[in-house]
């Protein structure tokens, strides 16, 4: 560590700093992105781009103008599941064609705890991972999202609508059924199953990839569960940082790194999901 400061503007403008990672609370992403634009440094900003769609669209336009003036991509966004070895393997298996075309998938993200989360944050902080990674996984765009609150959990803080059920449809016709749980009390639980014409592909709680094809079924790994997402996705964060550092240092664009357009779309889909909740 060369130095420390409580002033983010001082940090970003310091000549000893080559590039900046923004990992501040979600509500500070927009002001910190504005400082990043002023600094002229390359930035990796953790998702979301903003906590509201209006703010997301405004800052996205500022970033577009900034990058157009500079002549290259300067700001990426952190959606680490794109770099998770298990998600990358599922993507490879889907693209192999061996399983036929995907028809629908199930997805689960259940946290032990989600400090400071709000009902809106269930979309912009947690479900936003699903909205991004499945665009990337299927190379597709979202057509519709319908969200529901089932019976509320007694483990959730007062005023929080938790869990959340989401039914989504991609433009290709692939459908999703997913659930988001902010407080579950049993362990970090993140799983998917992609059901294809000729078989299924699953990611288990421990990140193991299991397939069912040609009358041969794999077995999901058992064992102690992670306490939180940082333990489960540690390798994903590291690979994302390596990819970003390589892009910054060499100028070679990594297509898996999320752009401002990816970040904005994730917020737009989150807003679509929030607006779809029955009144």
What are these regions (language model features)?
Residues 2-62:
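Beta-loop-alpha module in the N-terminal Rossmann-like domain of NAD(P)-dependent dehydrogenases
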Residues 158-159, 171-242, 256:
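NAD(P)-dinucleotide binding in Rossmann-like oxidoreductases
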Residues 6-9, 109, 150:
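Conserved SAM/SAH-binding loop
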Residues 3, 18-19, 74, 104, ...:
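Short, Asp-centered acidic motifs that coordinate Mg2+ and/or phosphate
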Residues 19-21, 64-74, 243-279:
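C-terminal helix-rich "cap/oligomerization" subdomain common to oxidoreductases
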